UniProtKB/Swiss-Prot annotation:
Gene: atpB
Organism: Rickettsia felis (strain ATCC VR-1525 / URRWXCal2)
Recorded GO CC terms: plasma membrane; proton-transporting ATP synthase complex
Key word DNA-binding present: no
Protein's UniProt name: ATP synthase subunit a
Keyword Membrane: yes
Subcellular location: Cell inner membrane
Domain of life: Bacteria
Length: 242
């Protein structure tokens, strides 16, 4: 199974740790999430530790990323969304760096595992729920009954809206994990055929691999953006009840 396209997603224990009967071992997934966090912190430290009136290219790139997240919150929530910039920005950067780090050879893509993406999605879900109840109290429950719903249809609508609400973390996490896994499997399969194809098609497979890698990098960035924009939309539901 060492050459299986799915072998790249195997979880491997590096340090076996047991706490209170639970397995909390340090794995290859853990080390790549830690590495992604360190790289992100290093990137923004180098970009902002010596800010100048005429910014460097590194500072400009960091400011573009920050403004992208700030604009997402502003467009979806408005001024009230500014207080959530640290949370949403951290989510976007963590997912982005995990996705991009997984593109390097012989690395591991933490966001291809549902347990990682589901944990991030649950964080968003709990934040939205807590914010909704803190801001609106029991009136937050009106989210599950659209305005103007006929009384006879209310029970059915409440069930549908509640199910939709509870399904948010599942859909949010599955979308990210499935896209990252599918892209890496495709690259692995095509890379396996590249050497054989070069015998018959000369150098044609090489540009194809470059195009696919470029597309996968685009998908990695896009999936981080989609996860973040959906999180902003869910926060908007909690802050501005409709």
């Amino acid at each position: 199974m060492t050459h299986s396209p799915l072998a790249q997603f195997d979880i491997k224990k590096l340090i076996d740790i047991k706490m209170f009967g639970f397995d909390v071992s340090f794995t290859n997934s853990s080390i790549y999430m830690l590495l992604a966090s360190i790289l992100a912190l290093t990137y923004f430290y180098l970009a902002f530790y010596n800010r100048k009136l005429v910014p460097s290219r590194l500072q400009v790139s960091a400011e573009i990323v920050y403004n992208l997240v700030a604009d997402m919150l502003n467009q979806n929530i408005g001024v009230k969304g500014r207080k959530f910039i640290p949370l949403v920005f951290s989510l976007f950067i963590f997912i982005l760096f995990c996705n991009l780090l997984g593109m390097t050879p012989y690395s591991f893509t933490a966001t291809s595992h549902i347990i990682v993406t589901f944990t991030l999605a649950i964080l968003v879900f709990l934040t939205v729920t807590i914010v909704g109840f803190v801001k609106h109290g029991l009136r937050f429950l009106t989210l599950f009954l659209p305005h103007g719903t006929p009384l006879w249809l209310a029970p059915l609508m409440i069930v549908i809206e509640l199910f939709t609400y509870l399904a948010r973390p599942v859909s949010l996490s599955l979308r990210l994990a499935a896209n990252m896994m599918a892209g890496h499997v495709l690259l692995k399969v095509i890379a396996g055929f590249t050497v054989s194809l070069m015998i018959y098609l000369k150098f044609l497979p090489i540009p194809l691999m470059v195009i696919l890698i470029g597309f996968e990098i685009f998908v990695a960035i896009l999936q981080a953006y989609i996860f973040t924009i959906l999180s902003c939309m869910y926060l908007n539901d909690a802050i501005n009840l409709h």
